[in-house]
């Protein structure tokens, strides 16, 4: 995997940096693990915009990822590493000894032909999935469950990883990349190692059109809109917003806390540090 700086043959390619991985499979994805993915353009079932700056983009299939890894004791072999347009991490197609194929998140250093195992008897090896009670303290993990059997929810993006800090009774403490320390039940599963494709954060898109391919529409400032479109709009010539920054619907947009107290923080040991 390498970063390639593109030659400035046009204004759109000037400054563009691509991530090139010669090991990625160049054929079509495995058809048995594809599902239809419908585009919403950021609208809900009423047709109202619920998420701005979404629309268009290339057609995609959803790759069904096995986030639970519950096929215990059955060895699996990595058949190929693939690109997934739905996430920043690459994915691996694994073939289990019983003939079943599954997609999993590709781990850093994973290669075609690697042998993997799930379950409490699996060795501590990058790519193997075990309950946290069987993983040594200090191990870097990814694809960590928050509730036993629910499937991986934490550390799934490219280059992500959490550190197992300690075990106390039925709970373990893990430190996230943000610095937050959380409690997780020791029966929750996690995969050993870091997520691959860490260079993804170093790429440079280069042009607006490349973001349109990804389904991202332009972001327009409120101060250049008309008063009917945004609270910051209107005025003769260039004018300031005239009030504290708000969203198009009048909600404070800088610094206002929006967290609902209904969602418990009992599993958070220490919050992430200020950046």
Curated annotation (Swiss-Prot):
GO terms for biological process: cytoplasmic translation. It holds the Pfam family Ribosomal_L2. GO terms for molecular function: rRNA binding; structural constituent of ribosome; transferase activity. Gene3D superfamilies: 2.30.30.30, Nucleic acid-binding proteins, Ribosomal protein L2, domain 3. Keywords: Ribonucleoprotein, Ribosomal protein, RNA-binding, rRNA-binding. InterPro entries: NA-bd_OB-fold, Rib_uL2_dom2, Ribosomal_uL2, Ribosomal_uL2_bac/org-type, Ribosomal_uL2_C, Ribosomal_uL2_CS, Ribosomal_uL2_dom3, Ribosomal_uL2_RNA-bd_dom. The keyword Oxidoreductase does not apply. The keyword Glycoprotein does not apply. One of its GO terms (cellular component) is large ribosomal subunit. PANTHER family: LARGE RIBOSOMAL SUBUNIT PROTEIN UL2M, RIBOSOMAL PROTEIN L2. HAMAP family: Ribosomal_uL2_B. One of the primary rRNA binding proteins. Required for association of the 30S and 50S subunits to form the 70S ribosome, for tRNA binding and peptide bond formation. It has been suggested to have peptidyltransferase activity; this is somewhat controversial. Makes several contacts with the 16S rRNA in the 70S ribosome. NCBIfam families: rplB_bact. Belongs to the universal ribosomal protein uL2 family. This is Large ribosomal subunit protein uL2. It comes from Herminiimonas arsenicoxydans.
